[in-house]
């Protein structure tokens, strides 16, 4: 992987990730394909929304279908018929989410399968092996997602163990002679000093990119912004910056303003299935009875298949009847909305009009433009 940085405006960056399987324009949003599929969508449909890269879930693909079946197909690209770049998370966040059915030790994580209750052990080495079998273009280190709230001492212990796991991930990745890219994950909770220590340790080990982890786990939005404002300028400028698991459209806008290059989140797909649709004027709740006889398009500024062909009344009808097509059309729209947002951000950075773009983004939804501190490096 090669990261090319074209231009900046403030801390916002316009560039691209160049892989053998294709180029990813940044800032980029990665749709989430947990089980090797973006729910309800064919790979071709996902590509048509403008996606250059997908995120796969190491933990779930390890449990089902497993490494053996994956290797029989070649890798995840062949298994799901997506011949463009794939980033896989390490499984650390999913283990974190298991709560009471997992036990974390220095060696790794003991837990019971959420599928059948079987006892399972996952450690940095195994995570690297699984991601190797998936053929991931971007592999994420195995880490512990520091919970919120956590005391500074708790966050320090968690972060320091994640650093040790980062070294083990690096060593196993190299032992496997994996030709792809490995990203480190910065932890440290809401404590700036711990974030500094984490980043320094990761840079000393050496990675192809750096993710900001442990955010969007319940902390106030102000804390997320503060950590990004503090951390992003310290990440080596020639490496991509990835904000994991974020988020709402405004989170992407605010992340880009603070120097983030990559995002992923289940929000556009999950919200689509629940009838919450993102538009240029805000969220439309298609289940609301006001849409029952509305012949207008969902968003007249959107060029997606759904908006070009169907009315709000039809989408309301499909949802009320629990038709699968409704969820599919909603998903197509939400994914295209996110990709159009990223296209707009990239274009605004290129032309030096990011401030105008941000103002229009918020005012078109009847919202105030949030203040951003003077961002000087």
From Swiss-Prot:
GO biological process: queuosine biosynthetic process; tRNA wobble guanine modification; tRNA-guanine transglycosylation
Entry EC number(s): 2.4.2.29
Active site (catalytic residues): 89, 264
Coiled coil regions in record: none
Reactions the enzyme catalyzes: 7-aminomethyl-7-carbaguanine + guanosine(34) in tRNA = 7-aminomethyl-7-carbaguanosine(34) in tRNA + guanine
Cellular component, GO annotation: cytosol
Pathway(s) annotated for this protein in UniProt: tRNA modification; tRNA-queuosine biosynthesis
GO MF entry, a single one: tRNA-guanosine(34) queuine transglycosylase activity
A Pfam family the protein falls into: TGT
InterPro entries tied to this protein: ArchSynthase1/Queuine_TRR, TGT, TGT-like_sf, tRNA_ribo_trans-like
Residues annotated to bind substrate: 89-93, 143, 187, 214
Entry note: cofactor: Binds 1 zinc ion per subunit.
Keyword Protein biosynthesis assigned: no
Binding site for Zn(2+): 302, 304, 307, 333
Subunit comment: Homodimer. Within each dimer, one monomer is responsible for RNA recognition and catalysis, while the other monomer binds to the replacement base PreQ1.
Function of the molecule: Catalyzes the base-exchange of a guanine (G) residue with the queuine precursor 7-aminomethyl-7-deazaguanine (PreQ1) at position 34 (anticodon wobble position) in tRNAs with GU(N) anticodons (tRNA-Asp, -Asn, -His and -Tyr). Catalysis occurs through a double-displacement mechanism. The nucleophile active site attacks the C1' of nucleotide 34 to detach the guanine base from the RNA, forming a covalent enzyme-RNA intermediate. The proton acceptor active site deprotonates the incoming PreQ1, allowing a nucleophilic attack on the C1' of the ribose to form the product.
Naturally occurring in which organism (per UniProt): Shewanella piezotolerans (strain WP3 / JCM 13877)
Zinc found in the keyword field: yes
Family the UniProt entry places it in: Belongs to the queuine tRNA-ribosyltransferase family.
Full protein name: Queuine tRNA-ribosyltransferase
Cofactor(s) named in the record: Zn(2+)
Ranges where the record places region RNA binding: 245-251, 269-273
Gene label: tgt
Protein keywords: Glycosyltransferase, Metal-binding, Queuosine biosynthesis, Transferase, tRNA processing, Zinc
């Amino acid at each position: 992987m090669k990261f090319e940085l074209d231009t900046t405006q403030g801390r916002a960056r316009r560039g691209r990730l160049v892989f053998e399987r294709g180029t990813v324009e940044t800032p980029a949003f990665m749709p989430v394909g947990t089980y090797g599929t973006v729910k309800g969508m064919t790979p071709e449909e996902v590509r048509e929304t403008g996606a250059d890269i997908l995120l796969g879930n190491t933990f779930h693909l390890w449990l089902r279908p497993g490494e053996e079946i994956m290797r029989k197909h070649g890798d995840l690209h062949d298994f799901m018929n997506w011949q463009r770049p794939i980033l896989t998370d390490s499984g650390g966040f999913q283990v974190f989410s298991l709560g009471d059915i997992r036990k974390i030790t220095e060696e790794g994580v003991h837990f019971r399968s959420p599928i059948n209750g079987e006892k399972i052990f996952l450690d940095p080495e195994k995570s690297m092996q699984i991601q190797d079998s998936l053929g991931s273009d971007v592999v994420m280190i195995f880490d512990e997602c520091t919970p919120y709230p956590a005391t500074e001492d708790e966050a320090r212990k968690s972060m320091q163990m994640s650093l040790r796991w980062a070294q083990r991930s690096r060593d196993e990745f190299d032992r496997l002679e994996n030709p792809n890219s490995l990203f480190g994950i910065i932890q440290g909770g809401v404590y700036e000093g711990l974030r500094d220590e984490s980043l320094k340790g990761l840079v000393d080990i050496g990675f192809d990119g750096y993710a900001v982890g442990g955010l969007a786990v319940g902390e106030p939005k102000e804390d997320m912004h503060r950590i990004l404002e503090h951390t992003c300028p310290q990440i080596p400028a020639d490496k991509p910056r990835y904000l994991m698991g974020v988020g709402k459209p405004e989170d992407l806008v605010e992340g880009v303003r603070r120097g983030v290059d990559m995002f992923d989140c289940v929000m556009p797909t999950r919200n689509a299935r629940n009838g919450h649709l993102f538009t240029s004027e805000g969220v439309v709740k298609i289940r609301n009875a006001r849409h029952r006889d509305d012949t207008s398009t969902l968003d007249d500024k959107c060029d997606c298949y759904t908006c070009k062909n169907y009315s709000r009344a039809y989408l309301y009808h499909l949802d009320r009847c629990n038709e699968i097509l409704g969820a599919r059309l909603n998903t197509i729209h939400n994914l295209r909305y996110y990709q159009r947002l990223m296209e707009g951000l990239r274009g605004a950075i290129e032309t030096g009009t990011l401030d105008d773009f941000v103002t229009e983004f918020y005012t078109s939804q009847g919202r105030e433009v949030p203040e951003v501190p003077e961002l000087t490096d």
